[in-house]
């Protein structure tokens, strides 16, 4: 349950995202996916950011706690971060409208990534202020994805 405007919202909208730090060398991404596969954990959404020395894989997995433990046990540097997922129509301007709602209320997007499936676009957002972000999205009737929905994508 999550509190928005002092009311309990019945679907937990904050999801756990894994951030895995990878050396820039051949095979490291393969190793991550093999560890997850061995544990039966599905990697359903991801993005990779990199610099000269390392990359960061940010991903949504089917079982975050299990994945975290497996990756730690295999000597990966991994963190868990709270994110929120939304679903919007996969048409021009749809995301711009949602981002305008947030920026007008002072919510800064630290990063985001998305994936589309037919007529629907799903967006993972890491805001600077989770409570305010969820409040704004709820008030504007944006379709928030429950964590359990994200883990099944």
Question: What kind of feature is each model-predicted range?
Answer:
Residues 4-153:
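A conserved regulatory-domain signal marking ACT and ACT-like small-molecule sensing domains
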């Amino acid at each position: 349950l999550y509190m928005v405007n002092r009311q309990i919202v019945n679907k937990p909208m904050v999801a756990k995202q894994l951030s895995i730090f990878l050396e820039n060398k051949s095979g490291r991404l393969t190793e991550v996916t093999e560890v997850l596969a061995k544990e039966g954990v599905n990697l359903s959404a991801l993005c990779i950011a990199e610099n000269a020395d390392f990359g960061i894989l940010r991903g949504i997995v089917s079982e975050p706690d299990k994945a975290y433990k497996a990756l730690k046990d295999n000597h990966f540097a991994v963190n868990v971060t709270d994110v929120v997922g939304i679903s919007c129509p996969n048409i021009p301007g749809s995301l711009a409208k949602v981002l305008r709602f947030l920026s007008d209320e002072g919510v800064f997007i630290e990063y985001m990534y998305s994936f589309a499936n037919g007529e629907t676009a799903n967006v993972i957002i890491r805001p600077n202020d989770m409570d305010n972000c969820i409040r704004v999205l709820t008030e504007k009737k944006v379709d928030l994805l429950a964590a359990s929905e994200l883990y099944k994508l």
